[in-house]
Structure formats: structure tokens, C-alpha cells
Amino acid sequence: MYVRSQTAGERVTESVSNFIERKLKLLVNKDKSQVCEVNQTKFLGYTIQKDGNLSIAKKSIERFNEKVRSITKRNRGVKIEQVIAELVPVMRGWLNYFHQARCKGLLKNLDSWIRRKPRCYRLKQCKRVITLQRFLERPGVDGWQSRILALSGKGHWRKSGCPQAHQALSNNRFDEAGLYNLTLNYDRLNNKKKPPCARACPVV
């Protein structure tokens, strides 16, 4: 329920709670009942902002991130293609539910982070220096630059953010592998990028 002030909210909460408990003989969950600013509440995973727009609640984002982390754990021992195949339905389902929120900036950051996770996963699979160097050289990374990264003492996560790793496992390669793109599909779901009109053909 939405009211004009904190005082009014507390008064209405007490009145409604009394009605529910005394008249309807039901128990009000005090832990889930609160009086606060509209942008501090969450409903079905959404938060309503002061301007009336929807945003995604922090807990909903955290749960999504945990699912991604679980799928991209570096010790799973499965092929990267399987990792991508498991990510796709999770990402698609999450966006289909939350696409009505104003969240394009968030989605761009998530896309970047999610692509880096399988990039890191794949680098870890190259357990030897020579294996990593050859993996980087295969898609066209300069041999000397490949060796620099392969010999680097950086951890796999830091390596995955380096230019050589981005070139070897580019965004285009992930697109070709079928990795779901949150930002592009957000535009599609909200009709911000309409597909080009088909060429008219005469009907005979």
C-alpha cells in the first residue's frame, strides 16, 4: 500500500495488521512487513523507483550471479561448449522475466562479466605454458604476445582480462558459439531495435 508519509504508513500498517489478525484470525509476518520509501521495497524481484520505473532488486541480481558462478566454476572439467549451453537458458529466462525493468547499463556490465567467466574457464584448461601459447596463437594472436601472457604469473582471472585473451576469445566468437547476449535481447524484447522490413514481393 502506498501512502504520503511515514506516519501514515505506520498508521495504516497497524490498522491492517489488527484487521488481519483479529477479524480474519491470520498471522502477519512481521519480518516481511515494513514501512519504507517506495524504492527500498521489492516485489516479485522488482524494485519500484521514485520516478515510477522498475529496476531489478539487488537480491535478484545476486541470485542470478550465483547461478552464473556455479555454471562457470573452473574445476568442473567439462568443455566450454557445455558451459555456454548451460548459461543460455539461465540468461534467457532471467531476462525474459526482468526485461520490463530499466536496466540496460546493468545488462552491459553483466554481459562483459559473463563473457569473461568462460574466457577464464578456457584459459585454465590450458595447464602448460606451451599449451596456452598455442591456444592463443591459433586464432591469430601474435606469437610474442601469446608467450608473454602464457609466461605471466597472473592468475587466470587477471589473464582473462588481457587483450590477448580478448582477441583469442572475442565477443564475436562467443556470439558464434551461441552465448546469449543480454543487451541485444533486451532491446529486442522492448522493441527498441525493430528488424528491417522484408522486401515486398508481388503476389501472383
Each PLM stretch: what is its role?
Residues 1-204:
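Non-catalytic terminal/accessory segments
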